[in-house]
């Protein structure tokens, strides 16, 4: 809002609080969607890893390494989905914190 240390009127504070509440509400949907995407990617990775492991030949270590190498793209998708969820979650928490700060001004 005001970056120059100009005092805010009660109306400005109330408008900012309303804006934060709306952003938090939208953020809940974003977090839920991102988490569902992460869970989908995590299941896909687990499934691909298990299939690659079972199809591989050799010792246990050899099979693990082959499965790991073959499933790197799925792991990357899972990691990207995890990062997106964590980012949305941190943003949601930051907005919630800002809302608490603004409410304490009122």
What kind of region is each of these model predictions?
Residues 1-27:
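Short, charge-rich amphipathic alpha-helices with coiled-coil/heptad character
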Residues 13, 17-20, 49, 67, ...:
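Generic structural signal of hydrophobic/aromatic residues within well-ordered alpha-helices
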Residues 20, 24-27, 31-34, 38-41, ...:
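Amphipathic alpha-helical coiled-coil segments
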Residues 57-84:
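Short, glycine/alanine-rich amphipathic alpha-helical segment
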Residues 105-106:
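Conserved small/polar residues in nucleotide/adenosyl-binding loops
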